[in-house]
Amino acid sequence: MFLSILVALCLWLHLALGVRGAPCEAVRIPMCRHMPWNITRMPNHLHHSTQENAILAIEQYEELVDVNCSSVLRFFLCAMYAPICTLEFLHDPIKPCKSVCQRARDDCEPLMKMYNHSWPESLACDELPVYDRGVCISPEAIVTDLPEDVKWIDITPDMMVQERPLDVDCKRLSPDRCKCKKVKPTLATYLSKNCSYVIHAKIKAVQRSGCNEVTTVVDVKEIFKSSSPIPRTQVPLITNSSCQCPHILPHQDVLIMCYEWRSRMMLLENCLVEKWRDQLSKRSIQWEERLREQRRTIQDKKKTAGRTSRSNPPKPKGKPPAPKPASPKKNIKTRSAQKKTNPKKV
């Protein structure tokens, strides 16, 4: 009895530790590099143990994706082959919604049948969860109202992010060759950049997930501006370049002004990263007020110009044309008149 309890306890601990230690890794499947999530976990829903195996398997659908037979096909395939990795669903990754699968199947199966193929059994829709009865993801949910724990990937000490060894070509891209331009934190810069998010954050980690992508993990402390909800937790910032500009190091406390793209927070060369000072919070708020005033002024001018153009029709440009002189009347003399006035001499 005691032995059975001990075995059960050890098994429970093994499973619990295994779940907590389940690794998340950067998405490396080329077809899925531009999904709203950039971190996945293996094995996936099709039981591929590595992304390399998943890449070989998903390649068979590249032509189908390229012909764009369905607007949700790529999303569905990536949700199956590179499932989103979140802390709450490490043991059982989130599946795509049944409706997404059905849309992709109904859109693309007629084309597949033209080439004597049918929708594969491995991608059957019957076993997938329904949106209102379980947890699942769809393109609409991510764009509009997806919960924070799904939209923003937590990278906490409980989750290990595996660093992939750099390719030979990537190793040649030495950081020393990158020359980052310093962007000064001024009002003029703020007005011209018109960034979509401004945050106070602490740099937690910087990792390269490919030759042309760097992921900077930051711990968000304050949010001064955002175009979409930003959680006050650890979030990834994506640099889609071989150069990490602006150049930052772990443990730095900074103010970041940059842009969002496809629901991903970016960290680009023309963005501003400044060592944190308390004065910067007041400045950023004042700058945002000036930016809004500038927008209101421009809108008011456009409205005024529109009203003026409607009330006063446009006048013709240039000088009015001069009146044409009356054409002189020609004194046409008939032959008989000519004979009378100019009689021939006899």
Curated annotation (Swiss-Prot):
Position of the signal peptide: 1-18
Q: State where composition is biased (Basic and acidic residues).
A: 294-303
Q: Enumerate the glycosylated residues.
A: N38, N68, N116, N194, N240
Q: Which GO terms describe its molecular function?
A: Wnt-protein binding
Q: Where in the cell is it found?
A: Secreted
Keyword Cell inner membrane among record annotations: no
Q: Which SMART domains match?
A: C345C (SM00643), FRI (SM00063)
Could you tell me what this protein does?
Answer: Soluble frizzled-related proteins (sFRPS) function as modulators of Wnt signaling through direct interaction with Wnts. They have a role in regulating cell growth and differentiation in specific cell types. SFRP4 plays a role in bone morphogenesis. May also act as a regulator of adult uterine morphology and function. May also increase apoptosis during ovulation possibly through modulation of FZ1/FZ4/WNT4 signaling. Has phosphaturic effects by specifically inhibiting sodium-dependent phosphate uptake.
What protein is this chain from?
A: Secreted frizzled-related protein 4
List the source organism. Answer: Macaca mulatta
Q: Provide the organism lineage as a comma list.
A: Eukaryota, Metazoa, Chordata, Craniata, Vertebrata
Q: What gene codes for this chain? A: SFRP4
